[in-house]
Curated annotation (Swiss-Prot):
It comes from the Bacteria. It catalyses: (R)-pantoate + beta-alanine + ATP = (R)-pantothenate + AMP + diphosphate + H(+). CDD domains: PanC. InterPro entries: Cyt_trans-like, Pantoate_ligase, Pantoate_ligase_C, Rossmann-like_a/b/a_fold. This is Pantothenate synthetase. Its main location: cytoplasm. It comes from Salmonella agona (strain SL483). ATP binds at residues 30-37, 149-152, 178, 186-189. Gene3D superfamilies: HUPs (3.40.50.620), Pantoate-beta-alanine ligase, C-terminal domain (3.30.1300.10). Keywords: ATP-binding, Cytoplasm, Ligase, Nucleotide-binding, Pantothenate biosynthesis. PANTHER family: CYTIDYLATE KINASE/PANTOATE-BETA-ALANINE LIGASE (PTHR21299), PANTOATE--BETA-ALANINE LIGASE (PTHR21299:SF1). Pfam families: Pantoate_ligase.
Length: 284
């Protein structure tokens, strides 16, 4: 496994891979890797000849400076995990390598609508930062496929739209959420939880299951369903942030013709903002 930190060396290897006709898969990450990331790697390995994992804590997508400062940087441990998985390349650039002129005046990629709704409304600039760094990685690495987790449901939808709108010839693969045995979705931010909070954390998934059962039973009183769910979360020790029930295919409000719903939930538990989602097939 080769660790690459500079753009010239990356471009050199990408040119060689292209000349050799290799099928390249990209797994973009911010490091602090867990089993959910490893599932992305496994999916990439199954679909390509060469796997490149990027590790870059992207300052452009953080809406709070304190969150950027305390985000875990675990490059050595991450590389050890990826080496065991027989990843071919790790691209781990410094911020100055990606944004040599700094963020001030930086050209960015924005995806209208999807970047400012739902999660984007509560985290201004976040999705603009995501689409910009992913676009830069696509331009640098020129992958045939790229793997993203379905845990970040809106992010995946945003990347798919960006790829379509910008005519990237890249297959976007969504990989299902990996959960702990108690149902908690794996996330780098779970590390912020205390031992006591970790016991409470699966409650978010349990509340989403309750919402799903109501939708499957035909209940469409969405505001009431959401209000009850928020109350349940608060009673469990969470601070409910946002719960939405949307059309899973468009992320717009549910209509009578919607075939699938997605429950999008975000809640604070101590210093950790946990997000999760669940898709539900609706009775027609």
């Amino acid at each position: 496994m080769l660790i690459i930190e500079t753009l010239p060396l990356l471009r050199q290897h990408i040119r060689r891979l292209r000349q050799e006709g290799k099928r390249v898969a990209l797994v973009p990450t911010m490091g602090n890797l867990h089993d959910g990331h490893m599932k992305l790697v496994d999916e990439a390995k199954a679909r390509a000849d060469v796997v490149i994992v990027s590790i870059f804590v992207n300052p452009m997508q953080f809406d709070r400076p304190d969150d950027l400062v305390r985000y875990p940087r675990t490059l050595q441990e991450d590389c050890e995990k990826l080496n065991k998985r027989k990843v071919d390349y790790v691209f781990a650039p410094a911020v100055e390598e990606i944004y040599p002129q700094g963020l001030e005046g930086q050209t960015y990629v924005d995806v209208p609508g999807l970047s400012t709704m739902l999660e984007g409304a509560s985290r201004p600039g976040h999705f603009r930062g995501v689409s910009t760094i992913v676009s830069k990685l696509f331009n640098l690495i020129q992958p045939d496929i790229a793997c993203f987790g379905e845990k970040d449901f809106q992010q995946l939808a945003l990347i798919r739209k960006m790829v379509a709108d910008m005519s990237y010839d890249i297959e976007i693969v969504g990989v299902p959420i990996i959960r702990a045995k108690d149902g908690l979705a794996l996330s780098s931010r779970n590390g912020y939880l205390t031992a006591e909070q970790r016991k409470i954390a699966p409650g978010l998934h349990n509340v989403m299951n309750s919402i799903a059962e109501k939708l499957i039973a035909g209940n469409r009183e969405l505001q009431e369903i959401i209000a009850i769910a928020e109350q349940e979360l608060n009673e469990k020790g969470f601070r409910a942030d946002d719960i939405q029930i949307r059309d899973a295919d468009t992320l717009q409000e549910l209509t009578e013709t919607s075939k699938r719903a997605v429950i999008l939930a975000a809640a604070w538990l101590g210093q950790a903002r946990l997000i999760d989602n669940q898709s539900v097939t609706l009775a027609q």
